[in-house]
């Protein structure tokens, strides 16, 4: 591998790091993953009717989950939602 290729690879990786690093430090991330508590409620794609809880930005709120799909802002109980999302 020539020196020009090595320098090009180093430059590319440096630019990639500079572009993505601020995103990793943003307020929407928690421990390296998107904070589930900021996601909107999502009923999912099926037509079942399961009582679930999501965090609406202030409190945990009940909603009807369809049973498949949706996102991670979905908890089986209000207590589980509050434990994960309520700020002390």
Curated annotation (Swiss-Prot):
Give the chief site where it resides: secreted
One GO term (biological process): envenomation resulting in negative regulation of voltage-gated potassium channel activity in another organism
**Extent of the signal sequence:** 1-27
The record's annotation in SUPFAM superfamilies points to: BPTI-like
Disulfide bond among keywords: yes
**Residue numbers marked as site, Reactive bond for trypsin:** 47-48
Q: What molecular functions are annotated in GO for this chain?
A: potassium channel regulator activity; serine-type endopeptidase inhibitor activity; toxin activity
A Pfam match is Kunitz_BPTI
Compartments, as annotated in UniProt: Secreted
What residues make up the propeptide removed on maturation? Answer: 28-33
Task: State the UniProt keywords alphabetically.
Answer: Disulfide bond, Protease inhibitor, Secreted, Serine protease inhibitor, Signal
Q: Which residues form a coiled coil?
A: none
Cysteine-cysteine disulfides: 37-85, 60-81
Specify the BPTI/Kunitz inhibitor domain's residue ranges.
37-85
* Function according to Swiss-Prot or TrEMBL: Serine protease inhibitor that inhibits trypsin at a molar ratio of 1:1.
This chain belongs to which protein, by name? Answer: Kunitz-type U15-theraphotoxin-Hhn1l
Organism of derivation: Cyriopagopus hainanus
Q: What is the lineage of its organism?
A: Eukaryota, Metazoa, Ecdysozoa, Arthropoda, Chelicerata
